[in-house]
Regions:
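Acidic catalytic/metal-coordinating carboxylates
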Residues: 51-54, 77-80
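Active-site residues of response regulator receiver
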Residues: 70
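Hydrophobic/aromatic residues positioned on beta-strands within the core alpha/beta folds
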Residues: 97-99
């Protein structure tokens, strides 16, 4: 076996259904952890962004399958960026993640009504993230 090969990965990669993912967070360390986790699940990180405005521009440029985005960021927050991305149809799904979303006065139900494909609280559950990605990889349609 090649010593440079990766460990066994979750099922989505094994069946060749790879999602193209844009990761957005204002904290570089969080962007890296989220991106590494998604790559471990067998999906492709097509880019990253540090805030909502950059996320909107990167989604337009990259056309990812999924945007995994923090909510509380300087400038344009994740909910506003999600709305812009979904209205422009530059990504199929947006998964919002946050540990501080309550301080913005937005509820989980509101996020889902506004079009979020999912919401995860930080620190996120890796198993739950893998499950969402696997489900979305099996369903390439727009939600």
């Amino acid at each position: 076996m090649n010593s440079g090969s990766k460990e066994q990965q979750p099922d989505a990669a094994a069946v060749g259904k790879k999602l193209r993912v844009l990761v957005v967070d204002d904290e570089p360390a969080v962007r890296e952890v989220v991106a590494d986790t998604i790559q471990f699940a067998g999906h492709e990180i097509v880019g990253t962004a540090k805030d909502g405005a950059e996320a909107v521009a990167r989604a337009e440029e990259l056309r990812p399958d999924v945007v995994v985005m923090d909510i509380k960021m300087p400038g344009m927050n994740g909910v506003d960026a999600m709305t812009a991305i979904l209205n422009a149809k530059t990504a199929k799904r947006v998964l919002l993640i946050s540990g501080e979303y309550r301080s913005l006065g937005v509820t989980r139900d509101e996020m889902m009504r506004q079009g979020a494909a999912g919401f995860m609280e930080k620190p996120f559950n890796v198993t739950e993230l893998f499950g969402l990605l696997e489900r979305w990889a099996g369903d390439r349609s727009v939600h």
